[in-house]
Swiss-Prot record:
Protein name (record): Phosphatase DCR2
Any one Gene Ontology molecular-function term assigned to this protein's record: phosphoprotein phosphatase activity
GO terms (BP aspect): negative regulation of endoplasmic reticulum unfolded protein response; traversing start control point of mitotic cell cycle
Binding of ATP, residues: 116-123
Compartments (UniProt record): Cytoplasm
Gene3D superfamilies, sorted: 3.60.21.10
Protein role: Required for cell cycle progression. Has a role in the completion of START.
Keywords: ATP-binding, Cell cycle, Cytoplasm, Hydrolase, Nucleotide-binding
EC number: 3.1.-.-
Length: 578
């Protein structure tokens, strides 16, 4: 018989006790129902716009709902492997008789911030029940018998017709078609975390005066909500167009590394006594946007620092795009290797990004949930100011994935797949009516050709390089020959992120068109820097159609009004090296 050392015996005893406690909670505690849906026999949960007009509900649509109950579940979790909910607290527990007519929405964001961060512990989740306006008309006065009222307000202190809930008070009012014409009812609810959280969507309200709840080891949770009948401003996909001067300016935001809460700076340079990472990063971004006033902003990955976003990646995504949305600037986005390491998958993040105001983010027909093709491979053209049917430039956006899935053969980072290169090549050949003009491509992880410091056509000579080359290029070990596709598509400039302390542009001569391969340079204080001290920076591009040229320059966090490393990239006037 094998006898375990005393230390391991103790660990085994702890494990047995822990499993017994977990099983007790799982088997003995009352279970929580997850889904309460509409009775499918009711045909009027969705109606057309004419119905709303006839009822005097101008501005209403089937997207509108009435929040009629709010509650939260207490749960117990073991890592990310098991989570069981054993206790429920709700304001309208007497709604039992009307549940079959309601739809329950659970916000999968742990208010305690424990799930995903601790091996085991207690988690809490907010939920709310909604009723569609068409059902208000259908049931009429029976709603009062079912004790169905709707939420009209959320306040810090109790008011008339309000009920205490967590650290706030919720106000309920009776509902009817007539009252819907007069009162404002809350239609949808979400939660954002951190004292610096932002709600950039115009028809949503963020209650920042007081938190919904604040736990000791968690960022404060704030309610954000919208009212019925409020429509967002039309901010769908924008048509990209040159200015009257024949120019098109792009601000590239690389490696912002934002998270939930303000967080401390990492490798700040120059160093200050106190430094909050995200506020400093956001201020820098706002300054550059106000100075440059670009026609497009491109996020080139790692805008979200995954391990700082386990509580809620949506909060961080909204924080990243808020300065751009506030200035009504169209924006595109690709993902890096850290974005989906928080609470949301790449696909879930993409679903949010694709519908946000001024977003150009698109799914390709081949994008997959398992990321084998990546998520967010798309193309946009820039059109002439004189002839809106004639493009003057093309922009390609590709998902460069994360880490190699065949690490024993090709260790390190993943690569853009041959199927992705073929997709944009086929799209170019079939769907782009006009194929002339200046072209750029954006993704996160650099190509292997970023290592081509030495000339391929002139042995012993170096390729032109402008900017800072401080750290090793972490390109994938496998070469999917994307540079060949980019050359065939006549791409002039490629720009990526990933390596924070490199900000150079290299003119690679391994293909006939000699493509410029550029880094954006790390912009966020929440990511690494170092290498002797590296100040955060942002790169700007200006496509000049009249000159058939692309200019680029950069700005530093500490001196955003000054530019450096200016290049005219296609006229031969760039310095050979700096």
């Amino acid at each position: 018989m094998i006898r375990l050392p005393r230390l391991y015996q103790r660990y085994l005893l702890y494990l047995v006790v822990f499993v017994v406690i977990a099983l007790f909670y799982f088997l003995q505690a009352p279970r929580v129902e997850e889904h309460i849906g509409f009775d499918l026999a009711l045909p009027i949960s969705h109606v057309d716009n004419l119905w709303f007009q006839n009822k005097g509900l101008e501005g209403f649509s089937n997207d509108d709902k009435l929040v009629v109950n709010i509650g939260y579940d207490e749960c117990f979790h073991i890592g990310r492997f098991y989570e069981g909910c054993f206790n429920r607290h709700e304001l309208k527990s007497t709604l039992t008789d009307g549940h079959q007519y309601l739809q329950r929405k659970r916000i999968h964001k742990d208010l305690r911030g424990s799930f995903g961060r601790r091996w085991f512990g207690k988690s809490e989740y907010l939920y709310y029940d909604v009723l569609y306006p068409a059902l208000v008309d259908y049931f009429g006065s029976n709603l009062e018998k079912l004790n169905v009222e709707a939420v009209t307000g959320i306040s810090k202190y109790p008011k008339d017709k309000s009920l205490p809930f967590m650290d706030v008070s919720i106000t309920f009012e009776p509902i009817s078609i007539e009252l819907l014409q007069k009162r404002s009812y809350i239609s949808d609810i979400n939660i954002l975390f951190g004292v610096d959280c932002i709600q950039p969507i115009a028809n949503w309200t963020l209650q920042k005066e007081f938190p919904l709840v604040k736990y000791r080891y968690s960022e404060p949770a704030y309610l954000t909500y919208k009212f019925v009948g409020t429509r967002p401003v039309d901010t769908g996909a924008q048509r990209l167009q040159e200015t009257d001067e024949g120019k098109f300016k792009i601000v590239q935001l690389a490696d912002l590394h934002l998270g939930v809460g303000e967080s401390e700076c990492i490798d700040e340079y120059p160093k200050h006594e106190a430094c909050k990472a995200d506020p400093k990063t956001e201020t820098f971004v706002q300054q550059v946007l106000d100075i440059e006033k670009p026609q497009l902003v491109v996020f080139t990955g790692d805008q979200i620092m995954g391990d700082r976003s386990i509580q809620d990646s949506e909060t961080v995504l909204l924080k990243a795009v808020a300065p751009v949305i506030a200035r009504k600037i169209p924006w595109a986005m690709v993902w890096g290797n850290h974005d989906d390491e928080g609470s949301l998958t790449r696909w879930q993040l993409s679903e949010i990004a694709s519908v946000l105001p001024y977003s150009l983010f698109k799914f390709s027909p081949h994008d997959t949930h398992d990321n084998t093709f990546g998520v967010g491979n798309y193309i946009y053209q820039i059109f002439s100011n004189n002839d809106t049917e004639v493009p003057v430039g093309t922009l390609y956006f590709l998902d460069s994935h994360k880490y190699s899935t065949v690490g024993k053969i090709y260790p390190g980072y993943d690569w853009i797949k041959e199927s992705q290169w073929k997709y944009i090549e086929d799209y170019h050949d079939v769907n782009l009516k006009f194929k002339t003009g200046l072209s750029m491509a954006f993704f996160h992880i650099p190509l292997p050709e970023y290592l081509n410091i030495e000339s391929k056509t002139h042995p012993g000579e170096k390729n032109p390089l402008i900017g800072m080359y401080k750290e090793g290029v972490t390109a994938p070990k496998y070469n999917s020959e994307g540079i060949t596709t980019l050359d065939r598509l006549s791409v002039d400039v490629v720009s990526c992120g990933h390596d924070h302390c490199n900000d150079y542009c290299l003119r690679d001569d391994s293909t006939p068109n000699k493509i410029w391969l550029c880094y954006g340079g790390g912009g966020g204080e929440g990511g690494y820097a170092g290498y002797g001290g590296t100040e955060r920076r942002i790169r700007i591009y200006e496509i000049n159609v009249n000159e058939n040229n692309i200019h680029t320059w950069k700005r530093l966090n500490g001196s955003p009004k000054e530019i450096f490393d200016f290049q005219s990239m296609l006229d031969g006037n760039s310095p050979e090296s700096v």
